[in-house]
Amino acid sequence: MYSLVSCAALAGIAEWVCCPGRLNAPLYRALAACPAVHRWDVADNSAAAFFALGRVQATGRPVAVVAGSGNEAAAMLPAAVNAYYGRHPLLIVTVDDAANGGGTGAPGCVEQESLFGIYAPTVQLELPCPVSDLPDLAGQLAEGFPVHLQLRVDADAVMPARDMSTLTVAEPPETPPFRGSLVALSQMLRFHAQEGLVLMIGALEPAEQEPVLWLARTLRVPVVADAASGLREELAASCLHDAEDILCETPPPYVLRVGAVPESPFWPMLEDMPDTQVFSITRSGFSGLTRQSEVIEGEPEQIMKALGDVPHVGDALRLLPASRQASGRTEELLLESQESAPALVRAFSMHASLAECVCLGSPTASALWNRYAQWQVPTLYLRSLHTMGSQGVLSTFLGLSAGAESAFCLVGDLAVLRDMAAPAILPQLPPGRRVIAVLANNGAEQALDDTEDDPELERLLCQPQEFRLADLAALWGAACYPIHTEADFEVLDTADDDALIFLEILPE
């Protein structure tokens, strides 16, 4: 086990999230003997995996999570899915009895090979083993995808103790070179973009924001920026309001997407716009479309350097004047409906704008934030946590905000119910104020636009939950405040700097 910890340290793994398990004790003894490694203890396997995913996103380093026995490891599959599509290097470790493994039906023994399918390929390792047999974790995690390490151990063996006090953790693996040809993109920018180009910016890592901001300011084209890009407020003057309406009325000949797959409603509409050519610069490598498009996979900074100088293109289709009119209509709406969900999200965004970390934990939360949140103060670090589903949102938020003095999260009520074990992690976190605003959306009713004229379908699809958020908050030792108007947010002005606070947003 000591050689395994050393192997992981060479891959840049400085944090281990550990679940209790029948065969995990030797590994945990080795981790306890290594002061260079930080260990988190989480009882729930799903919460542990999502917390580890949050730590990967917060640190930019690979993080290991150790599963419990038997079928408990399967609870980590949703986190593996999120890590795969977000391209985050998560190492999932499962421990199996070499003498009585999966396939026997013995208590606590399940087939672990290929447990996570394509989302985390399995690497098998039988311990103890020679150093030469240890896997190249650094190389396998360098691509940025999750990996499943299946350990097979002798349950009766006694592991000798070793001195781990001098072990150091290496820097994370270097990012591989970008993949894809820049020829078509370069020709479009230099010779055709003046016909009409829109820049769509999805979620970005903090290190990606500066080169993408340079690109947007150089091109000077209309922008559709997700809140999770971190550039929505910086590029406010170029951002399109009600983008889906404006761009459907005046389809652009070219769209350049940078970052993750955009959350804008206009993005899926591109499936039915074959005359619009789509180019993507993305770290994940996923096109986000079933139709043909040009994808360049890699870090934006590498790609911008290879692309060289780009021209000033401007608003060739005159989209921004229509956007300013839409912005005016939005402001009128907020003034007329000050107790509506959009108005309360606007007020919440003003309080959250100065936090070190802001997270959005449901599609409804992201849609409201992207359209109605404040535009004046740049949000330093904003994440969407629900891209592949709303499971594990609170655990991921706590992992992301573990080192933050102030962190805010906006989620739906179902996301809270699906991650009720998350706050058990709180006693291990450094001091800080964590504010979780919960949108009361009647069991996802507000997210189902297609049920407005079909009450029976609404009855079948909606899942209203009879629960009181205040009771859950009390279970976790948190304060809970109902929010009906903008003035109700004043409770945050007097709240402790080290507290977990729930805000139950109850719009008209």
Set out the residue ranges of the language-model regions:
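Thiamine diphosphate
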Residues: 83, 93, 98-113, 119, ...
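Structural signature of the thiamine diphosphate
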Residues: 4, 12-15, 59-67, 73, ...
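Glycine-rich, anion-gripping cofactor-binding loops and their flanking helix/strand elements
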Residues: 57-58, 68-69, 75, 200-281, ...
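Active-site diphosphate/adenylate-binding microenvironment
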Residues: 4-14, 19-32, 323-404
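Structural motif
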Residues: 19-21, 68, 127-129, 150-153, ...
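Glycine-rich, acidic loop regions that bind phosphate or pyrophosphate groups
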Residues: 83, 93-137, 225-322, 426, ...
